[in-house]
Curated annotation (Swiss-Prot):
GO molecular function per UniProt: ATP binding; ATP-dependent protein folding chaperone; unfolded protein binding
Stated family: Belongs to the heat shock protein 70 family.
Cellular component per GO, a single term: chloroplast
UniProt protein name: Chaperone protein dnaK
UniProt-annotated location(s): Plastid, Chloroplast
Source organism of the structure: Trieres chinensis
Highest taxon, organism lineage: Eukaryota
Record keywords: ATP-binding, Chaperone, Chloroplast, Nucleotide-binding, Plastid, Stress response
HAMAP family on file: DnaK
One Pfam family in the UniProt entry: HSP70
InterPro entries: ATPase_NBD (IPR043129), Chaperone_DnaK (IPR012725), Heat_shock_70_CS (IPR018181), HSP70_peptide-bd_sf (IPR029047), Hsp_70_fam (IPR013126)
Function recorded in the entry: Acts as a chaperone.
Amino acid sequence: MGKVVGIDLGTTNSVVAAIEGGQPSVIVNAEGLRTTPSIVAYTKKQELLVGQIAKRQAVINPENTFFSVKRFIGSKELEISADSKKLPYKVVKDQNGNIKINCSSLNKEFSPEEISAQVLRKLINDATSYLGQDVTQAVITVPAYFNDSQRQATMDAGKIAGVEVLRIINEPTAASLAYGLDKKQNETILVFDLGGGTFDVSILEVGDGIFEVLATAGDTNLGGDDFDKVLVRWLVKEFEDQEGIDLTQDIQALQRLTEAAEKAKMELSTVEKTTIHLPFITADKTGPKHIEKELTRKTFETLCQELIERCQIPVEKALTDARLEKSDINEVVLVGGSTRIPAIQNLVESLTNKKPNQSVNPDEVVAIGAAIQAGILAGEIKDVLLLDVTPLSLGVETLGGVMTKIIARNTTIPVKKSEMFSTAVENQTNVEIHVLQGERELVAGNKSLGNFRLDGIPAAERGVPQIEVTFDINVDGLLSVKAKELETGIEQSVTIQGASNLDESEVSDMLAEAEKYAALNKEKRQNIDLKNQAETLCFEAEKELDLFKTSIPEEKQQNVQKLIENIRQDTQTDNFESLKLLVEELKMAMKDMVEAKPFVDQTDTDPMSNLNDL
């Protein structure tokens, strides 16, 4: 079996970690960095870029640079807010209402799972290079408040990337593993996880190798991206008031504003004020226009006050669900880069009466926890038991459009529960089972996970047939549902996979497509290496010709020069098949040329050779 890694697939950045020498450690990527931007781009030449290299070219290629895609994974277009779709790239929907991301460079539409898969593939490839062994399996983290569709979609992204996802675990739970692995005494910890696009709060009992989640709450549409957007809107309005130009119509300007907003937000975590300087942001008939704006931490906090206040609700909800007072919390662990914002740290301290524990790196702790879970599954770490919970209630639609809950939120998983139902009308011979997830009383306010039908019910009076509906949630938090008519024993079951928006054939096609691009990239890299090798060889050959032109036969010199010309021509025209052959020919010609050089006796030229021994 290959190495199992832990992956934090983040909205803004992703991290991969593994167990080395019995300890979890973050794996450095190909660029030498510990975090990889969750960004995928396709250039005008249809070249795939992932990570830092994709981020660097975002300003000049905004329409084909895809970031914050995690916000769309496993969701329908109707479920996404209009604000979330205000991006430099186009977010559209297919005929089934599924989200698609338009790539004008390839004239193609991608699912969010495909884009996420490209990030996963890079992480896996970098881990393989770093560890020196194949990586084929992974534990991937998701926000605790991800629903069944989003979890299944994350599994699909893993499949498309060509990796077997052994386990999906919640990000705050992973963070608690990293924090509490060596804790012997029992502690109640609150994990406050504010990342780039999602927000989770989990309360856990940790100690003696047991990690039990007591409650979880969150908001999958709140994160650092939203703070950036507030700053972008502020900059756009200030510029329009001053210059009368609306920058929202210029996607390159918007991309520059977004990058500047993120940079300013990060700087304000350590300084009281910063200056946003964007020369040549646009131009009109009077000439070029620039932005130079001072932003204080106080102004930033005022602008983002609503977002900061939204962080309060899940904390209070988690405490209520866990039946705990703030005084019962022993430690508060901060996770996610956005927890570096001083106003967030102050909010957490006021809500819990505890100074947040900052002994863990908020950017890396989730991946470290995922690596620990990977180590547990691979047998590298023993005596650790993880008891997670389902974040949202699950149930079925019953008469009158009501949701009847079968598994309540914050139930420890894996779990299996059954409820008895009957028919609503006389002589009813089939029932439609509509599976739902959420906390609202009525069907309309909850997430529909899927439908299936149980046929063959014996005709009888209303309320007589007994239909047992069983919900089964596995360790990944994924659901399967079974309905059984007790008199006849007829049953029908379904694994809720349609919720992921992709069927098996689509996932297979996307995997093939991803592998094709991986092969193309490998070929492209080999061709670049061949060009570099050819140029180096030509340089060496020219040097040899220059050094020994008087002592090498003319026909051999002409042969080498002709080969150099042909190689440079093939390099210009990208004729790689011919180039490969010519490089080998030049190597042989150079060897032949060197062997044709007359031997020079070095002793004859030694100025000391005529001296007699003393």
